[in-house]
Amino acid sequence: IDEMNKLGILIDLSHVGPKTSSDAIKFSKKPVAYTHCCPMLKKHARNKTDEQLREIADADGFVGFASYTPFLPKGEDTTLDDCITALDYLINIVGEEKAGIGTDWVQDQDIHFFNYLSYDKGKGRPTSTPHKKVPSMPKG
């Protein structure tokens, strides 16, 4: 973290758990970010709790809202309005100046790629049920 701070590299905590996030937020001398995540409106290992979001905002960090439908409450039925509702929820926690868009969308990949993404720690621990089809963009 010291070397990243020294070199001006943004520390992205989107893919790490609560303890690592908290430790990095406390240790870093510069603001850190969740560049692409969702608030815990749906229980998912990659989503962040209100407490985690407040902690990063209190340390002048940034949170990018991910419109990745598997992380959102309605899944494949997520609409653009649902994304706006979730983004508003995020803004109410971290503030307008510390929230943005971090879509986290990957294109031109097959179902095997998305199922690979559903694992944490290699193939040792799935964080969600396997995808039956390639996730879609929000509707509308």
What is each residue range found by the language model?
Residues I1, P31, I111-G140:
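Active-site gating loops and adjacent loop-to-helix segments of metal-dependent hydrolytic enzymes
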Residues I1-A33, A45-G61, D81-E97:
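Histidine/acidic residue-rich metal-binding segments in metalloenzymes
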Residues I1-L7, V32-C38, S67-G75:
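Active-site-proximal beta-alpha loop/turn segments in soluble metabolic enzymes
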Residues I9, S14-S21, C37-M40, Y68-P70, ...:
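Active-site beta-loop-alpha junctions enriched in small/polar residues
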Residues A24, H44-R46, G75-E76, I111-F113:
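Short, well-ordered secondary-structure micro-motifs
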Residues A57-L80:
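A conserved active-site cap/scaffold subdomain adjacent to cofactor or substrate pockets
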Residues A66-S67, V94-Y116, H131-M137:
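Short acidic/histidine-rich active-site segments
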Residues G75-D82, I91, K139-G140:
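Short amphipathic alpha-helical interaction segments
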